[in-house]
């Protein structure tokens, strides 16, 4: 059994990406499409592309694939980036998870069938394999697959493996055991709309030994740990082509930072620079970030 740098558990899908000329259109109007692609996407799919492009060996698992997703994922993730998808289940009765995204000047709007996917009586995602976690250095964990995601957190805790996660509540097992939890502005507004941000941040840090990061798009990043004062950092400024995948690639940068034993400040710097680099180019699977560009952005 080979040893991988990274094990990722979460959502990998086929995305139809339409980059618009200008901003998102008003209803009942016309908008020109500048570029269009069908490429790997999803929180874990995008994360895997970035980590592979940074020189990491990656194995991923999570949702089932089907006839409409397998070809593009095999072409890019497996053959182009060398990502191990050998454990992912192919379900010929299921098309696979897909979405369609319209990308405006500073927006990206996603259309999909995730409500139907997660609301279905049939769970179309794998149970995690303990041996996959045992044979990696660091784990990236999406919290969306219910008991199975929590099982990954339990395995990591039992095996002493550090993991980075995203967008889970402060009273969950996944948050409790995490090395890093990254909370997006979208998640915070959707789940804690009335909460004072600093009080909420403190609640998060009190419920884990790990690093907590709050992101707010182009506004200041908040980060810190239990019994520490809140630290802040301004995101890096770049000429934005597309904000699609910014959160997924921030997570990838944090995973890389944990793998390389970076300090908290360096993890946040590297994650923010990785996300900024991705925002400056499009699409991710054709133009992934590289260490030279990321480090140049940090050092400048």
Predicted features along the sequence, with ranges:
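Conserved N-terminal subdomain of the carbohydrate kinase-like
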Residues: 27-34, 53-137, 295-300
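Conserved phosphate/ATP/ADP-binding segment of small-molecule kinases
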Residues: 153-232
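Structural motif
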Residues: 5-7, 137-138, 180, 211
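Conserved phosphate-binding/catalytic region of the ribokinase-like
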Residues: 2, 197-300
């Amino acid at each position: 059994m080979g040893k991988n740098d990274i094990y990722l558990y979460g959502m990998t899908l086929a995305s139809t990406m339409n980059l618009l000329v200008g901003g998102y259109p008003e209803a009942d109007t016309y908008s020109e499409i500048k570029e269009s692609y069908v490429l790997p996407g999803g929180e874990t799919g995008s994360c895997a592309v970035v980590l592979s492009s940074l020189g990491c060996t990656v194995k991923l698992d999570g949702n089932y694939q089907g006839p409409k997703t397998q070809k593009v994922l095999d072409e890019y993730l497996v053959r182009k980036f060398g990502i191990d998808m050998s454990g992912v289940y192919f379900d010929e009765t299921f098309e696979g998870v897909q979405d369609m995204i319209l990308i405006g000047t500073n927006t990206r709007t996603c259309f999909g069938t995730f409500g139907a996917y997660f609301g279905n009586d049939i769970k179309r995602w794998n149970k995690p394999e303990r041996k996959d976690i045992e044979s990696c250095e660091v784990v990236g964990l999406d919290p969306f697959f219910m008991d199975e995601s929590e099982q990954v957190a339990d395995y990591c805790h039992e095996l002493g493996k550090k993991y980075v996660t995203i967008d889970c509540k402060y009273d969950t097992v996944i948050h409790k055991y995490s090395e890093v939890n990254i909370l997006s502005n979208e998640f915070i507004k959707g789940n804690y709309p009335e909460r004072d941000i600093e009080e909420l941040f403190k609640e998060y840090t009190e419920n884990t030994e790990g690093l907590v990061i709050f992101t707010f798009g182009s506004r200041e990043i908040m980060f810190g740990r239990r019994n520490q004062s809140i630290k802040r950092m301004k995101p890096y400024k770049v000429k934005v082509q597309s904000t699609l995948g910014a959160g997924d690639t921030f997570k990838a940068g944090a995973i890389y930072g944990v793998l390389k034993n970076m300090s908290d400040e360096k993890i946040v710097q590297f994650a923010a620079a990785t996300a900024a680099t991705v925002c400056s180019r499009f699409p991710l699977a054709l133009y992934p970030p590289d260490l030279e560009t990321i480090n140049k952005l940090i050092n400048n």
